């Protein structure tokens, strides 16, 4: 080997080394989060003074409720996770933010509320109580975490108690913390020395202890299907169940004020219970809410209900026997699917219709339009596609809805077609919309006149249809436990099943690129299927590393982006026979849908809105070289 050959070899090795290093960097930097629209349903609420504090997805919202009939938002702050529970003490809000752990928010000036500190936790932060400089946080399977918040900017854990079951809720009274531990009932923790807590008592409850409130010598437990349970804790080491009240629905939330307990019953709204005789609680009032009552807080003569997709409901309870709503603030529901076109993203909000998000500045997306679909909350938009100036919404029990989005700020429905099944997904090709209609199979809709759509064909193969992609005269459907189905739609009025392939999981998302179909197969991960011969699809590889459940997939360039329950997975599929993980991002909600558009990836994150990511680079450098000048890689040695 002469000197020049040796130099060429060394230069080539350097390129390989740089590529390897860049690949590692990409695994860390890809996907790169660019922006968030983090709004979603309301789970938790607290009230203090003239303000109500509640969650909308991963946003803490502060509302002025000094006039209960006219509540209005005065501040908001984005958080690292979904707002499951919160406590307010002085000018700080302490938020149990799900995957984001504990967030400490300065609310002294509501209009400029700011996160001043936080602490990641091992599990899912579901509830929090604050007392004497400590936050007591329930962290799902990780029990009770005791966190020193004397310096709000630098909270740190001082101890924990690994309670049995699922730690859902917590209340603190005196020297004791009371933990609602799911099917393991109520646990009583001595916190007289926060650094050395210990469980001193427990009582089983007949249902699932979700939330707890303490007043005087009694703890009041929202016990799931078993309603309200009243526990005498006058002797904390020997708690005793002394009363109960069966309620219609699922007791999810509770607060106590005076002689009354206020219980949130999910879809059955608010119940007011007289607890003046703890051994004999009596329902005295009720009020159904439009959503699901997930959280409740009482302040003065008002009850504030975190009503899931119903937002914040303000209820006058000055007469506990006759509660009535006086005001509300709406929130979005669950982001099930997303598609992007131009400078807008379109979100299928299962609980409240189609939302239009301006993404012209992807670092700061803003909602600009919304249209409700019929039958809310049962309309349940599950999928969305865009063609021209129309959005096509798969609306579950309400079939296909066609929305004019020519003016994004004022979308309106122009046409619809009821379908016999449950419309989960939709794809548009030419003059036809193809609806994955669950048990109703694949429906083919002529949308050449969007105001007068008409079904022209259908096929009801085994397994149903839960998502669909159309390419080259074929519709490819994710068919649940039937796997992948290939349907010839060259004659839209006469679709014909021409090929199929069973998958090990439950096929519910699909994308097609070239001769490859990419199937999000739930527990089966990502399946890579050669469909170059549509009648004979063949799996060439798969990626299933136990990272959760693959719900949806979008392919852009050399990468497959998989909505994988709690994260976005990025899979390098440049060699389709050997997919390799290139990166991942833990999303604050449940990554349910994913779409690629231009240089961005959009994730529908269920109860945390939408995240926008930069498309991962095809190569470590845009042109394959570190600089734009290839001579920088010259191997010539004088």
PLM feature spans:
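Feature marking well-ordered beta-strand scaffolds used for ligand recognition
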Residues: 25-618
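Short regulatory "switch" loops immediately downstream of catalytic or recognition motifs
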Residues: 1, 16, 373-374
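N-terminal targeting leader peptides, primarily classical Sec-type signal peptides for secretion
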Residues: 10, 26-27, 625
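Bacterial N-terminal signal peptides
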Residues: 11-22
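Extracellular glycan-recognition surfaces and repeat-rich motifs
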Residues: 630-638
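Extracellular carbohydrate-recognition regions
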Residues: 619-631
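Bacterial N-terminal signal peptides that target proteins for export
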Residues: 1-13
């Amino acid at each position: 080997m002469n000197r020049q050959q040796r130099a060429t070899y060394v230069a080539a090795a350097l390129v390989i080394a740089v590529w390897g290093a860049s690949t590692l960097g990409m695994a860390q930097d890809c996907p790169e989060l660019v922006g968030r629209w983090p709004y979603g349903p309301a789970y938790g609420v607290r009230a203090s003074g003239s303000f109500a504090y509640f969650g909308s997805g991963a946003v803490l919202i502060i509302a002025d409720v000094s006039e209960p009939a006219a509540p209005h938002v005065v501040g908001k702050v984005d958080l690292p996770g979904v707002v499951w529970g919160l406590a307010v003490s002085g000018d700080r809000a302490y938020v149990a933010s799900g995957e984001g752990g504990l967030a400490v928010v300065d609310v002294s000036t509501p209009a400029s509320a700011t996160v001043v500190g936080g602490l990641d936790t091992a599990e899912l932060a579901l509830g929090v109580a604050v007392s004497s400089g400590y936050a007591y946080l329930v962290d799902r399977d990780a029990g009770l975490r005791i966190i020193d918040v004397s310096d709000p900017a630098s909270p740190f854990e001082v101890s924990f108690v690994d309670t049995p079951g699922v730690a859902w809720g917590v209340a603190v009274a005196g020297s004791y913390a009371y933990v609602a531990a799911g099917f393991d009932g109520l646990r009583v923790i001595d916190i007289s020395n926060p650094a050395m807590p210990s469980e001193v008592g427990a009582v089983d409850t007949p249902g699932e202890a979700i939330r707890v409130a303490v007043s005087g010598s009694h703890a009041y437990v929202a016990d799931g299907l078993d309603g309200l349970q009243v526990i005498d804790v006058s002797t904390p080491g020997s708690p005793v169940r002394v009363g109960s009240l069966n309620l219609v629905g699922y007791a999810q939330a509770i607060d106590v004020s005076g002689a009354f307990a206020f219980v949130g019953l999910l879809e059955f709204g608010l119940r007011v219970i007289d607890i003046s005789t703890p051994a004999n609680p009596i329902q005295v009032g009720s009020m159904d809410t439009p959503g699901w009552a997930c959280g409740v807080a009482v302040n003065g003569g008002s009850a504030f209900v975190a009503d899931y997709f119903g937002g914040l409901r303000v209820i006058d309870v000055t007469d506990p026997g006759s509660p009535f709503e006086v005001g509300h603030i709406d929130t979005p529901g669950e982001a099930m699917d997303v598609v992007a076109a131009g400078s807008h993203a379109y979100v299928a909000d299962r609980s409240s219709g189609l939302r239009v998000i301006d993404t012209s500045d992807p670092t700061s997306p803003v909602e600009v339009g919304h249209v409700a679909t019929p039958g809310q909350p049962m309309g349940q938009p599950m999928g969305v596609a865009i063609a021209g100036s129309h959005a096509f919404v798969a609306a579950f029990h309400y079939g296909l809805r066609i929305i004019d989005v020519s003016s994004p700020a004022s979308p309106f429905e122009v046409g619809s077609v009821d379908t016999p099944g449950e419309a989960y997904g939709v794809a548009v090709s030419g003059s036809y919309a193809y609806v994955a209609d669950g048990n109703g199979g694949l429906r083919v809709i002529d949308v050449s006149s969007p105001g007068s759509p008409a079904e022209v064909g259908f096929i009801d193969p085994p397994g149903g249809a839960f998502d669909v992609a159309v390419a080259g005269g074929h519709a490819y459907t994710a068919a649940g436990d039937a796997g992948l189905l290939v349907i010839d739609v060259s004659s839209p009025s006469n679709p014909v099943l021409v090929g199929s392939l069973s998958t090990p999981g439950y096929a519910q998302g699909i994308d097609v690129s070239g001769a490859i179909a990419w199937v999000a197969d739930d527990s089966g991960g990502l399946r890579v299927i050669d469909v170059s011969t549509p009648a004979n699809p063949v799996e060439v590889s798969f990626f299933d590393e136990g990272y959760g459940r693959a719900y949806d997939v979008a392919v852009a360039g050399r990468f497959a982006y998989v909505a994988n329950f709690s994260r976005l997975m990025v899979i390098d599929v440049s060699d389709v026979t050997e997919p390799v993980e290139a990166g991942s991002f833990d999303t604050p909600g449940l990554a349910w849908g994913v779409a690629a558009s231009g240089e961005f990836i959009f994730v529908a994150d269920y109860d945390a809105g939408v995240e926008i990511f930069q498309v991962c680079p095809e190569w470590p450098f845009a042109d394959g070289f570190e600089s734009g000048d290839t001579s920088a890689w010259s191997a010539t040695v004088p």
